[in-house]
Amino acid sequence: MTAPVRDWNADAYHRVSGPQVAMAAAVLDRLRLRGDETVLDAGCGSGRVTRLLLERLPDGRVIAVDASPDMVARARQELAGDPRADVRRADLAELRLNEGEQVDAVFSNATFHWVPDHAALFARLAAALRRGGRLSAQCGGEGNVAAVHEAALAAAADAGLAARFEGWPRPWNFAGPEQTAQRLRRAGFGDVECWLQGWPVEPDEPRAYLETVCLGPHLERLDAGEHERFLDAVMARLGAHPVLDYVRLNIVARRGGSVDR
């Protein structure tokens, strides 16, 4: 199952994504890199975290992929001139590297929850990894920003826009650790560890952050002329300085034996 590609504002995301950069530090640490590996950055966004990954690979390289054309363009701009960075547009659920190409490790930050089919996702990542290769990832997990989305739907009612969200198939997949571990093992991973971690976020630019990071799918349900009314109602619900209830799903695993490519 392939999700429609979100129309991200990559420049805005690059500016407001400080919390995602902070979240990435421990995920990078868990890769335990030597510095000469080839690493897949699965969902590179605007390239801010890819640059941090490259700092750990003085003699290695990164294949950075993202489904969003705007994010890919911004990442190429961010990483221009670095021969270790290969930025490509790709849907992770349908990911296929070049013929005969595999990576030593997979890194991903704040991406997997945008992929509806995690079984397909993990199968494609396993196929991209060499045997024994390590996966270190973090994404939105079960309960992630639940209060934010509850406030957003209440705000839509406040703004007279509730009908736009009737029967809405929400586009994110905030999975739990147990089901994620099962899917990873079925895809050919071993040494699997998955756990949830609360991570409250107090963004520096709350309105811009919510508009860019959290509420993009909501805004796509509305006409352009309704966006500001909806955002006004959301901010009235959350307050001027909200603390957002992030819950992160941490994933560590190692690719086991042979898998179908």
Q: PLM features: what roles do these ranges have?
A:
Residues 1-37, 48-52, 71-74, 134-159:
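Conserved class I S-adenosyl-L-methionine
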Residues 105-118:
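A short SAM/SAH-binding and catalytic strip from SAM-dependent methyltransferases
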Residues 119-134:
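A short glycine-rich, Lys/Arg-flanked "PGG" loop and its adjoining helix->strand segment in the class I
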